[in-house]
A protein has these predicted regions:
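N-terminal export signals
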Residues: 5-26
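N-terminal structural segment of carbohydrate-active enzymes
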Residues: 29-80, 110-112
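Glycine-rich, aromatic-flanked loop segments that form ligand/cofactor-binding clefts
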Residues: 40, 68-72, 99-144, 181, ...
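Aromatic- and glycine-enriched glycan-recognition loops and surfaces
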Residues: 47-65, 87-110, 162, 229-233, ...
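Short, acidic/polar
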Residues: 49-62, 160-170, 263-270, 332-338
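Aromatic-lined carbohydrate-binding/catalytic grooves of carbohydrate-active enzymes
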Residues: 65-98, 122-139, 189-200, 264-270, ...
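Carbohydrate-binding surfaces of carbohydrate-active enzymes
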Residues: 114, 219-220, 224-256, 264, ...
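Active-site-adjacent "subsite" loops/lids of carbohydrate-active enzymes
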Residues: 120-175, 208-223
Length: 721
């Protein structure tokens, strides 16, 4: 939020309590090194690179990246060691070498960990010939193939004693690996193989549906069953590892929030898998030139950290493979910006390349890998054991994405979450992204406000928890069809959160969508105090038909466009009684209900008026002044973390178009941060300089003279006793 917004908001702040997400499990055990942000480099080795492979050169190139762990190709589709497991293809290019043993020994000598990459998603024709029932089948019985390989079903013995377990045992007993990285886990698509049919029949006493059909109520059951099947597979693999050797790191590639349907397609629910891995790892592969997803790396890191309750691993794809250019790098400034966001929100990094350093055609991002991993290494004292703090929680609901979003999940739900998160970042409101599992009384109490961007699917228990939270002094900001559907995606007769929203669903209203319409100011309110010089704001999108209840008020209502044909006949927008922004106040709590998809509209249009409405709504709901006021451009992202006696303000500069081609240096950024205690020192970490400051009444004021791509302001407070 800018200084101007703060002055115009007409709300004055007292202190600012912050939430603290405490990692599950203590980090004192040095054997569990993954409880701190990790620095992983992953040179995806191609089989052809075995020719003339130089172990010394390989390890030196890995050490140059500042990584503390290297993901090395081990087995699955190709064995990079002399495996004795049946059907485990050993590359003839090894020529008798035990490459895995050589590399592990050399990495350990150089002070780096060795993480064995295994891929149990596909197999060769010989295994398909001998065990055809282990493979994914389409509804017509045909096998699913990826190139010359056959896709394997995670419900089959292949992921157990048939193949995966013997490979894991062989590697653990013969090699001093520090962990495993599972590539391409989950389902490659809907599977109708005999194993899936038998398992589904045994569980539900019904035939396995041939596809996900949202018109069929069984699809909710089918989607949940697929998630559970994947989780069971990963848990079995983890247990097998633990049975051979304790404290072995185990992770697998999961979806980032930039690819919202990947989780459902492959049946990889991050919340459901939170206990299946040592660390949760999510891929951010947003290589397409979409300017609206500039915040998605940080959003993903924040979400996965809160779900896993420990530092996540953000797998940043260096190339533009998702856009069709596997051998071309993302622009270095763009790639770095994604890495800084992940770091700023408490994540570790895994930086992959498609090929070994020195052999790939486009190595421009190797310098970025070295710089960002180097920052994590040099300033480990800042990142290790630091915990995110924020007054606001934004909820990402996988259930809403699945059962409300259905076949149009991005447009119906994800775009709303993207838009509101962007508005929070661009109003400089520190925010943590949580799952809908956090909508419980004990967890909600950690936050001063909870944001529900079109969270349509809300259970009765969640509705009760949110209602009690608001009545006890918390704040809720919700949009569009939040709570209009039950957890299975069935529409209710009314809003489950009607009591706190101050609105009742009115399906008789004829207004459900609007194009080139307006949010019109109807009465003065703090949320609209910034609207000087205008009483109308542009809007196009979907409207939830509601009517006011109780003492709620509607500062903004729907205005129709009127005649748009000729200037001579053009009329002012026609105000209606249809409420679009509803404010409700209780004895201590507050709520804002935006009865339209203004968040989606902001994501798609990037019109600044929508950002300011959403930001002002959150500030008003918080009940006092913003936790942070700055003159920084809206494209500077802020996040906060705490490690006593230090508070860290992370600044990520995203100024510029997308893909980002260069870093635009910004000067003289003034910050007013409510910290609630005395301050000893303020310094800029990366520049290595102290900053003059003024501390008064629990607020510290300072100026950052210059901001490049990323900076951390370190605020030292008196030691806690």
């Amino acid at each position: 939020m800018t200084r101007r917004d703060f002055i115009e908001s007409s709300v004055f702040l007292a202190g600012a309590a912050s939430s603290v997400l405490t990692p599950a499990g203590a980090a004192e055990d040095s054997s569990q090194w993954w409880l701190k942000p990790v620095r992983l480099f992953h040179p995806n080795m191609r089989e052809s690179e075995l020719r003339g492979f130089d172990t010394g050169r390989f390890v030196a190139s890995c050490a140059a990246t500042n990584a503390d762990g290297i993901v090395v190709s081990a087995g699955g589709i190709v064995a990079f060691y002399p495996s004795q497991v049946p059907y485990h293809y050993v590359s003839p290019l090894l020529n008798g070498r035990d490459l895995l043993k050589e590399v592990i020994a050399a990495l350990h000598t150089a002070g780096m960990r060795a993480i064995a990459r295994v891929d149990f998603s596909k197999a060769r024709a010989d295994l398909f010939r001998d065990h055809p029932d282990w493979f994914v089948r389409s509804a017509d019985g045909s096998p699913r193939m990826a190139g010359k390989y056959y896709d394997v079903c995670p419900n089959s013995p292949y992921l157990g004693e048939g193949f995966a377990f013997p490979v894991i045992r062989e590697i653990l007993k013969g090699y001093d690996v520090d962990g495993f990285h599972l590539n391409a886990g989950g389902f490659p698509g809907h599977c109708c193989c005999s194993k899936c049919q038998e398992k589904y029949q045994a569980r539900f006493g019904a035939k396995l549906p041939s596809r996900i059909d949202w018109k069929d109520g069984a699809s909710t059951q089918l989607v949940s069953w697929r998630y559970q099947s994947s989780a069971e597979c990963f848990t079995r693999l983890h247990e097998e590892i633990g049975a051979v050797r304790k404290d072995v790191f185990w992770t697998g590639e999961l979806a980032g929030l930039d690819n919202p349907t990947w989780s459902r397609d492959k049946a990889l629910d991050i919340v459901g898998l939170s206990h299946s891995f040592s660390s949760l790892m999510s891929t951010v592969d947003n290589a397409s030139p979409d300017p609206d997803l500039r915040w998605v790396a940080g959003m993903t890191a924040s979400y996965v950290r809160s779900v896993g309750e420990r530092p996540p691993i953000i797998n940043l794809k260096v190339s533009m493979r998702s856009a069709g250019w596997a051998h071309a790098s993302m622009p270095p400034a763009e790639y770095a910006q994604c890495a800084w966001q992940a770091i700023a929100h408490g994540g570790g990094l895994k930086m992959p390349t498609f090929g070994l350093p020195g052999n790939i055609e486009d190595e421009r991002n190797m310098a970025v890998i070295t710089e960002t991993l180097g920052a994590l290494k040099k300033h480990a004292w800042v990142y290790d054991d630091a915990r995110p703090i924020a007054p606001v929680a934004l909820v990402w609901s996988q259930r809403t994405l699945d059962f409300y979003g259905r076949d149009d999940a991005k447009a119906r739900y994800a775009d709303c979450a993207y838009g509101f998160y962007a508005a929070l970042m661009e109003n400089h409101i520190p925010t943590v992204v949580v799952s809908d599992e956090a909508l419980l009384p004990g967890k909600l109490a950690d936050f001063r406000a909870v944001v529900l961007p079109n969270m349509a699917c809300v259970s009765d228990a969640q509705a009760r928890a949110i209602t009690e939270y608001v009545r006890a002094g918390g704040a809720m900001i919700a949009t569009h069809e939040t709570s209009l559907y039950d957890p299975s995606g069935n529409r209710r007769a009314g809003l489950a959160l009607e009591q706190v929203m101050g609105a009742a669903y009115d399906p008789a209203s004829p207004t459900t969508s609007a194009k080139n319409a307006y949010l019109c100011r109807r009465q003065p309110h703090a949320v609209t105090a910034w609207m000087r010089g205008t009483s109308v704001l542009p809007f196009s999108g979907r409207i939830t038909p509601v009517r006011l209840t109780g003492d709620s008020v509607a500062p903004l209502v729907y205005g129709s466009a009127g005649n748009l044909v000729d200037p001579e006949e053009m009329e002012n927008p026609v105000r209606t009684d249809v409420p679009l922004l509803i404010a409700n106040t209780f004895s201590s709590g507050k709520s804002i209900y935006v009865a339209c998809d203004l968040d989606r509209f902001y994501f798609r249009s990037r019109l600044d008026d929508a950002r300011r409405v959403l930001g002002s709504a959150v500030v008003w709901a918080l009940g006092d002044s913003p936790p942070l006021v700055t003159n920084a451009p809206s494209e500077v992202g802020v996040s906060l973390s705490r490690k006593a006696p230090f508070t860290f303000l992370h600044l990520v500069n995203t100024v510029g178009g997308r893909p980002l081609s260069e870093v635009v240096t910004i000067r003289d950024l003034e910050f007013h941060l409510r910290i609630g205690t005395k301050v000893k020192t303020v310094s800029a970490l990366r520049r290595g300089s102290t900053l003059p400051f003024e501390a008064r009444d629990g607020q510290v004021t300072f100026t950052v003279p210059i901001l490049g791509a990323y900076e951390v302001v370190v605020i030292e407070t008196p030691s806690e006793r």
